[in-house]
Regions:
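Cytosolic-side transmembrane helix boundary signature
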Residues: 1-13
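Flexible, solvent-exposed loop/hinge segments and secondary-structure transition points
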Residues: 5, 26, 33, 37-157, ...
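Short, flexible coil/turn micro-motifs enriched in small/turn-prone residues
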Residues: 9, 21, 181-184
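Hydrophobic membrane-insertion alpha-helices, especially the h-region
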Residues: 12-32
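Extracytoplasmic/periplasmic C-terminal soluble domains
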Residues: 154-216
């Protein structure tokens, strides 16, 4: 009899532990993780950037350089070069799905030649001397898909963007200032400009759009 009572007590204790762990690990913990994730719902969904109609035009964390047909006026602010293609083509837009930093080091003659080509091409596009082109305009980032450019590179593009879009340079500079982010925590990194959000502020988006879902 004592054995049976002891067995029942142990079984009951085991069931209580099972129910408690099921409630904590199977319900409360997943609910807490879901709730924390919803605090930054946009970030959890890829930080999509939408235009005024609600269409997704990109992600604020993925830099995709706008492409303009050769010979057409260029109204866009442009990103940094995509690192994944730096060893093949100095001007290729690249594919964010497979973006990686370039494996070309500072002593690479290929990288040096590409940097020179990019500097000359950007100088011609912006109507400035090659030595005026900032370093981030001709080099890829560590990720290869940096969505930001330096305020210096944004300022270099202001006259062209203002002219093509029929805006005053002061108005475009104001938009650049409004889309310039400060250092993280006040001391980490440098000031930076999100290119996608800046182009969107100008009313410019890439010619594609993902319609919002019924719940989005």
């Amino acid at each position: 009899m004592r054995f049976l009572i002891g067995l029942l007590r142990q079984t009951w204790a085991g069931l209580l532990v099972l129910l408690a762990l099921t409630a904590v690990l199977g319900v409360l913990y997943p609910a807490a993780v879901w709730g924390v994730g919803r605090i930054g719902a946009g970030a959890a969904e890829g930080s999509p950037v939408r235009d005024t109609t609600g269409c997704v035009v990109g992600s604020r964390w993925v830099g995709v350089d706008p492409q303009v047909p050769a010979g057409d006026p260029d109204p866009f602010f442009h990103n940094r070069v995509t690192g994944s293609v730096a060893a093949q083509d100095p001007f290729a837009p690249g594919d964010p799905a497979g973006a990686l930093p370039t494996n070309q080091g500072p002593s690479s003659e290929i990288l040096a030649a590409f940097v020179t080509q990019r500097r000359n091409a950007i100088a011609a596009r912006e109507g400035v001397q090659p030595e005026s082109v900032p370093a981030d305009a001709v080099t890829g980032s560590g990720s290869g898909i940096d969505p930001h450019i330096s305020p210096a590179y944004a300022a270099l593009q202001v006259p062209r963007v203002a002219h093509v879009n029929g805006l005053s340079e002061s108005r475009v500079r104001q938009l650049v200032d409004e889309n310039t982010e400060g250092r993280q925590l006040g001391f980490l990194g440098e000031q930076r400009v999100n290119v996608l959000e800046l182009n969107l502020a100008l009313g410019l988006t890439v010619p594609r759009c993902t319609a919002p879902t019924a719940g989005g």
